[in-house]
Amino acid sequence: MRFDFEREKSRDVKQKHGVSLRDAREIFDQVYVVDQKSGNPEQFRAIGWCRGRLCSVIFEVRHDSEGEYYHLVTAWKATTQEEQSYAQNV
């Protein structure tokens, strides 16, 4: 699985939410829950483990000459509602 994100945005997200987009890639290495977040552009939310805590990441599925990759948009420590959703769906 390939990932892409803006480095400056990753630094901003880490300062604001305590988790970088680089760290958020870990979510996809384990069991995670996905739902659709918005339709235009089509974005998804994944909830899973990252740096020893539940986190959420918003991503877009994109394509290039090498195939499919995930463009990470933002991430944060999972809310109580997201923790419950994860627990109910794994």
Model-derived features with residue positions:
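Ribonuclease/tRNase effector modules and their secretory precursors
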Residues: 1-90
